[in-house]
């Protein structure tokens, strides 16, 4: 769901945004990120204490904020491949000089690799998010499947999509196939 990227944002990244917000920098970030706890407090706490935190729905709004002020604006970017594209597009398209990006973006295959390689992992296969695969292409998961010996099925979030993915994943596991399938 929409809160997933904030769930995997590292505490030091949140702490860095909090420090900036309390030093006069305007932090622009997604609403869910404001409530994520850092080591001692959240961005919401920092805002209540005078920190400069702005909730935005896209990086485009952070760009607008930067154009409306001479203050330093930092977009605290979180998310996976789907939100990284918009962040990268702004970074490559002559953003305002007073706009910086604090990237907390995550890369799905790297996260899967950590889970697959964990010594206590008992996972036999993975269902990968279809919306991320739309950005990267589902073939991105082929090296992972080959390296780990675990199948990957790409699916959407609708109940039937997930059920179809589970069925295909069970079939691949039963057949001993470490391949990638787009459900």
Mark where each language-model region is.
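Metallocofactor- and cofactor-centric catalytic cores in central/energy metabolism, strongly enriched
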Residues: 1-70, 84, 91, 96, ...
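Gly/Ser/Thr-rich helix-start
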Residues: 2-4, 80, 131, 157
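Short, surface-exposed amphipathic charged segments that create phosphate/polyanion-binding patches used
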Residues: 13-16, 67-73, 114-120, 142-143, ...
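Short, surface-exposed, charge-dense and proline/glycine-enriched linear segments
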Residues: 30-31, 62, 88, 132-136, ...
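Short hydrophobic alpha-helical runs that function as membrane-insertion/retention elements
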Residues: 54-55, 74, 100, 152-155
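Secondary-structure boundary elements
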Residues: 68-71, 92-98, 118-121, 150, ...
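Phosphate/pyrophosphate-binding betaalpha-module
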Residues: 76, 80-140
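A conserved active-site cap/scaffold subdomain adjacent to cofactor or substrate pockets
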Residues: 102, 122-182
């Amino acid at each position: 769901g929409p809160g997933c990227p904030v769930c995997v944002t590292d505490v030091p990244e949140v702490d860095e945004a909090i420090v900036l917000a309390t030093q006069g920098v305007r932090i622009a970030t997604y609403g869910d990120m404001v409530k994520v706890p850092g080591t001692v407090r959240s961005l919401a706490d920092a805002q209540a204490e005078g920190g400069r935190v702005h909730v935005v729905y896209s990086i485009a709004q952070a760009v607008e904020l930067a154009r409306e002020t001479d203050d330093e604006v930092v977009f605290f970017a979180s998310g996976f491949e789907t939100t990284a594209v918009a962040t990268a597009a702004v970074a490559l398209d002559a953003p305002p000089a007073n706009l910086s990006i604090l990237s907390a973006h995550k890369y799905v295959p790297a996260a899967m690799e950590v889970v697959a390689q964990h010594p206590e992992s008992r996972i036999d296969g993975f269902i990968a998010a279809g919306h991320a695969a739309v950005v990267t292409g589902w073939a991105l998961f082929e090296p992972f499947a080959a390296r780990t010996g675990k199948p990957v099925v790409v699916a959407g979030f609708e109940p039937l999509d997930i059920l179809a993915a589970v069925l295909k994943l069970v079939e691949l596991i039963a057949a001993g196939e470490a391949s990638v399938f787009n459900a």
